């Protein structure tokens, strides 16, 4: 497995090298503050501590981040010594095990978490649709990182202009 530590993935009958972009987004502004590129076989939860800036009070994530706060490398306090709350979406199968009233409360809670997480998904949408980054042309993590390091600030500019009405 050479091309700079990309994992080998099969799509249909074609074998390709896969990479994954992990990034942190500010929950208030919706702008990207950190970026890591790994091979595709690295799980999301292993990159949690690298994506935190130290200013966070609450960390939101999808069900791929379940158990992030229990890991050995987990950051439990921010730079100011305040405990970080991890608000991770549950899997739907976990919600089905609850009573009817418990399901109602859990779904409401999950909806609130998902509404914050939508800012992360919006950044993905901008990168994929506005900048047409669906398939990479480069092999190697360093080249992927360089390309994404160029695209994410552009996405930040686009999103900042739309959210805050900044004129350039």
Where are these regions (language model features)?
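Polybasic low-complexity intrinsically disordered regions
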Residues: 1-76, 82, 149, 154
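Composition- and surface-driven signal marking solvent-exposed, interaction-prone regions
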Residues: 37, 138-140, 165-168
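Helix-centered, glycine/charged polyanion-binding patches within enzymatic domains
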Residues: 53, 57-58, 63-142, 146
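C-terminal domain-tail junction helix/linker
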Residues: 146-152, 162-168
């Amino acid at each position: 497995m050479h091309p700079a530590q990309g994992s080998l993935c099969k799509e249909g009958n074609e074998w390709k090298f896969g990479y994954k972009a992990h990034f942190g987004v500010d929950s208030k502004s919706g702008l990207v503050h950190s970026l890591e590129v790994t091979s595709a076989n690295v799980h999301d939860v292993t990159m949690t501590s690298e994506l935190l800036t130290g200013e966070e009070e609450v960390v939101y994530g999808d069900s791929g981040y379940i158990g992030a706060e229990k890991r050995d490398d987990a950051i439990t306090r921010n730079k100011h010594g305040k405990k970080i709350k991890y608000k991770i979406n549950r899997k739907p199968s976990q919600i089905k095990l609850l009573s009817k009233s418990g399901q109602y409360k859990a779904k409401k809670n999950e909806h609130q978490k998902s509404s914050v997480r939508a800012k992360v998904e919006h950044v993905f949408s901008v990168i994929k649709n506005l900048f047409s980054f669906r398939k990479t042309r480069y092999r190697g993590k360093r080249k992927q990182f360089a390309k994404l390091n160029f695209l994410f600030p552009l996405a930040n500019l686009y999103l900042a202009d739309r959210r805050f009405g900044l004129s350039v």
